Amino acid sequence: MAVPYKAPVKDIIFGYEVIDSYNVLNKISAFSDFSEDIVVPTMEECAKFSEEVLAPINAIGDQQGATIQDGVVTMPEEFVDAYKKFAESGWASISLPSDIGGGGMPITLSGGTLEILSTANLAFGLAPGLSAGAISAINFHGNQEQKDKFLPKLVSGEWTGTMNLSEPQSGSDLGTITTK
């Protein structure tokens, strides 16, 4: 029988306190209201979601995994349902800039939530990071047409980002990787 997952909320909050993150971040105008009053309930809600929704489906990710058929990737239905709840709850965009529809919280806050999500279910927890990378690339380097087309769906969690490694001869060319 598996041991029930218990999110490390107290440890994460302790980490924020030890590095004095509230006072450090309060010096930045965008985070002047950042406090324990925001962090504690955020971590508690993330823990509740992770303990109740993500941890119970962790084994399914290992046992069933993702499949690809005719160019379409399919996840276990439990992962699809969990991701919908994740996106609807705003976890997908908690630290994204508010001017593109995100929560505008400091990335240190999403660091704590990502730790909770990932320790409950690593296969699930990896997805938000890939989306954040795609969102950042488009937001900082995309033209307005690309931003208008992709950012709303990525920020809302309707779409997810992917990892694309394709630089030939520069260390991330997956086609040339071999194993022993």
Task: Identify the meaning behind each predicted range.
Residues 19, 141, 166-168:
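Structured loops at beta-to-helix junctions and adjacent beta-edge loops in soluble globular domains
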Residues 111-115, 132-139, 163:
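Contiguous, well-ordered alpha-helical segments that form the cores/surfaces of helical PPI scaffolds
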Residues 107-108, 141-142, 176:
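Short glycine/threonine-rich loop-to-helix capping motif typified by GTGT followed
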Residues 1-126, 145, 149:
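Amphipathic, small/basic residue-rich leader segments at the start of a protein or domain
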Residues 95, 103, 145-180:
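Glycine-rich, Trp-frequent "lid" loop and neighboring beta-strands that shape
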